[in-house]
């Protein structure tokens, strides 16, 4: 992030770092407490109306949305826990390749809107902490260009069941406090 003089690095199997400090995705588990980052459509042919519907679906269920910068920076912020999730369409492999390694090495998940890990050539990308990623799939899968209506419904149902099963299996826990330094390090 040149505006903050931060350097994000990752090596497969060795972790993700910001300025030589280990980073991890956020610990939040409830979508309504999360900040989600995204990009905005700007190219001729982008379906602006569809993107606005997608943003409305996400905004109604989260604490807010941000537009920090390039997709690579958005993914770096997910990896550092500054934001809890990310989604965008119209992306090329060079937009997300480095950021995808940051996210996975920081403990997050990344894929297309139906949750499949094969996303590089799909021009749609979604990332987040595992529990948040699982809650974004049913919201965003209906906007995927790569799944039929039946597939989209099945993905939403499976994600909903997975979330319910996880919530039922875990006893109510105290809210995770914000880690010292994390909030003050956030760029917004």
Question: Where does each model-flagged region fall?
Answer:
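Active-site neighborhoods of divalent-metal-dependent phosphate/nucleic-acid chemistry enzymes
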Residues: 84-93
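AMP-binding (ANL) adenylation modules
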Residues: 115-119
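Anionic group-transfer/hydrolysis microenvironments
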Residues: 3, 90, 97
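Hydrophobic residues within well-ordered alpha-helices
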Residues: 76-79, 97-105
